[in-house]
């Protein structure tokens, strides 16, 4: 289920009518996006079951990586425009049953959300982009660019932004009112009873003037000291990376195996020179070679003719195996390290920026300084010598990636779950939803098992239902029934991975 900000941003983009505009999902991004700001997109996810599709604003702009220029770059402002998006839904139902006992139930439900905002569209004209491309990269290359090169990131530039002109309040409220009556014939007459239940939920979010609701981007391509701002998203930012996809055509006639996906490979990854890979790329595409170098869930499987293997992303067992392997590695860390991780992640859950900073440091394999809870994790990892024979950062990054797939509201609920120590019960409940429905692309009704709901109790159940609702499932506290939605599969998978690894840390 999209957040309030994401829902309004998507509706605004539809109203503007531009397919190239990307709606903003997170509040943190809305505060950092500006014209010329550089965006970072990670190359691959560590999971086969979710992806990090968001473009993350970095703390730099084009001006920070290029040689200074005396020319003044202008922008074109279109607007102001006024946009109002208000939706009110009301539902009413009545039901009566008479099987010796007369029972009647009536209910009303209403949903009300929306906003009213003023915005303008700020665009960088093409001639200004051409002026940028005439400037050279700073020498020496900025350190953050070196970090992005090491990670294999793709970089983009914001060229158009939809900005708020005034402060705006987004609101969301829902209510459910249920009235029930019962009549029972007894020996001396008729007994009657009735009850009523009312549930109201309200949320509000204030957006500050200048925040960006949507944006357009172009690919940043770096060749030696020159830059290119391109409309082609298929290029790599750092052109010295070697693309395995470039080798596929050359190897097609020589190999009987098929790759499930393409991977960008740096020649140093396999201790091979770039010359070796260019001269004999087929040696690096054999099933035997890939089996030894790709993760288990990405390995190539060649079946005899006539046999069909179910795609791994449609089998819940593959997700379980993937998560289990990460838990097994995480469990090798000392209890002290796991304790620090648990409480540090708990402290960072309400700060998406802090989580992203920790991921950046871990991906760089850097011993650089980081303040706060993230720094505590890095320091503890450096002090601990029990992991000389395995890479402890892989399961940590896997956990952080899974957390980052979830919404800011889910982060709040996760923090409550960690404090109440109900992670195991939640993990079992999520598993009970995913396991029977994982392979189905259509809507299927399901009922949550009472024995899985009972241990959560009232407050824990409300927290858990909130986590499920944010994944895209329609949940009601008074009703264990819901309907499977394939759009909920990815966030539910990320939630399952998050709960599983956090539970390992909790019980260490």
Swiss-Prot record:
A Pfam family that the UniProt record links to this protein: Gasdermin
GO CC, alphabetical: cytoplasm; cytosol; plasma membrane
A GO term, aspect molecular function: phosphatidylinositol-4-phosphate binding
Induction comment from the UniProt entry of this chain: Expression in induced by STAT3 and CD274/PD-L1 in response to hypoxia.
Family annotation (InterPro entries): Gasdermin (IPR007677), Gasdermin_pore (IPR040460), Gasdermin_PUB (IPR041263)
UniProt entry tagged with the keyword Lipoprotein: yes
Post-translational modification: Cleavage by CASP8 relieves autoinhibition by releasing the N-terminal moiety (Gasdermin-C, N-terminal) that initiates pyroptosis. The cleavage site is unclear. According to a publication, it takes place after Asp-240 in response to alpha-ketoglutarate. Another paper reports cleavage by CASP8 after Asp-365.
Region of interest called Triggers pyroptosis, as start-end residue ranges on this chain: 1-257
Annotated phenotype, changing residue 276 to A: Does not affect cleavage by CASP8 in response to alpha-ketoglutarate
Gene Ontology biological-process annotations: defense response to bacterium; programmed cell death; pyroptotic inflammatory response
Residues flagged as site, Cleavage: 240-241, 365-366
Tissue: Expressed mainly in trachea and spleen. In the esophagus, expressed in differentiating cells and probably in differentiated cells. Also detected in gastric epithelium.
Keyword set, alphabetical order: Cell membrane, Cytoplasm, Lipoprotein, Membrane, Necrosis, Palmitate, Transmembrane, Transmembrane beta strand
Family affiliation: Belongs to the gasdermin family.
Domain notes: Intramolecular interactions between N- and C-terminal domains are important for autoinhibition in the absence of activation signal. The intrinsic pyroptosis-inducing activity is carried by the N-terminal domain.
Protein's recorded name: Gasdermin-C
Chain's gene name: GSDMC
């Amino acid at each position: 289920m999209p957040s309030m900000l994401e829902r309004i941003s998507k509706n605004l983009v539809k109203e503007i009518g531009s397919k190239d505009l990307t709606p903003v999902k997170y509040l943190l991004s809305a505060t950092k996006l500006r014209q010329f700001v550089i965006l970072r997109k990670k190359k691959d996810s560590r999971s086969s079951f979710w992806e990090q599709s968001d473009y993350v604003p970095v703390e730099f702009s084009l001006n920070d990586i290029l040689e200074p220029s005396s020319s003044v770059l202008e922008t074109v402002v279109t607007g102001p425009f006024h946009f109002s998006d208000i939706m009110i839904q009301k539902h009413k139902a009545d039901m009566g049953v008479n099987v010796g006992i007369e029972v009647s139930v009536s209910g009303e439900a209403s949903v009300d959300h929306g906003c009213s905002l003023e915005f303008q569209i700020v665009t960088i004209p093409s001639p200004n982009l051409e002026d940028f491309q005439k400037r050279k990269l700073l020498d020496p290359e900025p350190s953050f660019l070196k970090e992005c090169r090491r990670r294999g990131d793709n970089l983009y530039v914001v060229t158009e932004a939809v900005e708020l002109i005034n402060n705006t309040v987004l609101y969301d409220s829902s209510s459910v009112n249920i009235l029930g009556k019962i009549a029972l014939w007894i020996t001396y007459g008729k007994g009657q009873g009735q009850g009523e239940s009312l549930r109201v939920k309200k949320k509000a979010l204030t957006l500050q003037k200048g925040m960006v609701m949507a944006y357009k981007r172009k690919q940043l391509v770096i060749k030696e000291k020159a830059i290119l701002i391109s409309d082609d998203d298929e290029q790599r930012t750092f052109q010295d990376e070697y693309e395995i996809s470039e080798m596929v055509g050359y190897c097609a006639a020589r190999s009987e195996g098929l790759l499930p996906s393409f991977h960008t490979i740096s020649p140093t990854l396999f201790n091979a020179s770039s010359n070796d890979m260019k001269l004999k790329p087929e040696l690096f595409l054999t099933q035997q070679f890939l089996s030894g170098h790709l993760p288990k869930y990405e390995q190539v499987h060649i079946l005899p003719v006539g046999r069909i293997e179910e795609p791994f992303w449609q089998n819940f067992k593959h997700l379980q195996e993937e998560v289990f392997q990460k838990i097994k590695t995480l469990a090798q860390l000392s209890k002290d390290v796991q304790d620090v991780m648990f409480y540090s992640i708990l402290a960072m859950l309400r700060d998406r920026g802090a989580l992203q900073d920790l991921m950046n440091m871990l991906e760089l394999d850097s011993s650089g300084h980081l303040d706060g809870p993230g720094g505590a994790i890095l320091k503890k990892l450096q002090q601990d010598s029990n992991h000389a024979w395995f890479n402890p950062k892989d399961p940590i990054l896997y956990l952080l990636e899974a957390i980052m797939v979830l919404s800011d509201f889910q982060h709040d609920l996760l923090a409550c779950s960690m404090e109440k120590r109900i992670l195991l019960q939640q993990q079992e409940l999520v598993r009970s939803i995913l396991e029977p429905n994982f392979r189905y692309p259509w809507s299927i009704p399901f009922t949550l098992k009472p024995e899985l709901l009972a241990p959560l109790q009232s407050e824990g159940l409300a927290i858990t239902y909130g986590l499920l609702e944010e994944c895209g499932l329609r949940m009601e506290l008074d009703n264990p029934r819901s309907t499977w939605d394939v759009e909920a599969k990815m966030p539910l998978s990320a939630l399952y991975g998050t709960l599983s690894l956090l539970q390992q840390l909790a019980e260490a």
